[in-house]
Amino acid sequence: MGEISITKLLVVAALVVLLFGTKKLRTLGGDLGAAIKGFKKAMNDEDAGAKKDANGDLPAEKLTHKE
């Protein structure tokens, strides 16, 4: 009774399609994909900035010696 079979998953998927419709699910999938893509891009941009700072590429005003 507690097992999840392929038949149960197909029934749930059919109910979801009937409830929301294919257009709504397609839109939801596109929005989710865009959100994941944006998140990955932000993470890559942050990593690139951290690597740039770690390599010593600092602005000139931070490298000058003040007495």
Swiss-Prot record:
TM annotation in the entry: 1-21
Gene Ontology CC terms: TAT protein transport complex
Membrane topology (UniProt): Single-pass membrane protein
UniProt xrefs under Gene3D superfamilies: 1.20.5.3310
Record-level GO BP terms: protein transport by the Tat complex
Keyword terms of this UniProt record: Cell inner membrane, Cell membrane, Membrane, Protein transport, Translocation, Transmembrane, Transmembrane helix, Transport
The keyword Cell membrane is assigned to this record: yes
Region (Disordered): 45-67
Family that this chain belongs to: Belongs to the TatA/E family. TatE subfamily.
Function: Part of the twin-arginine translocation (Tat) system that transports large folded proteins containing a characteristic twin-arginine motif in their signal peptide across membranes. TatE shares overlapping functions with TatA.
Protein name: Probable Sec-independent protein translocase protein TatE
Source organism per UniProt: Escherichia fergusonii (strain ATCC 35469 / DSM 13698 / CCUG 18766 / IAM 14443 / JCM 21226 / LMG 7866 / NBRC 102419 / NCTC 12128 / CDC 0568-73)
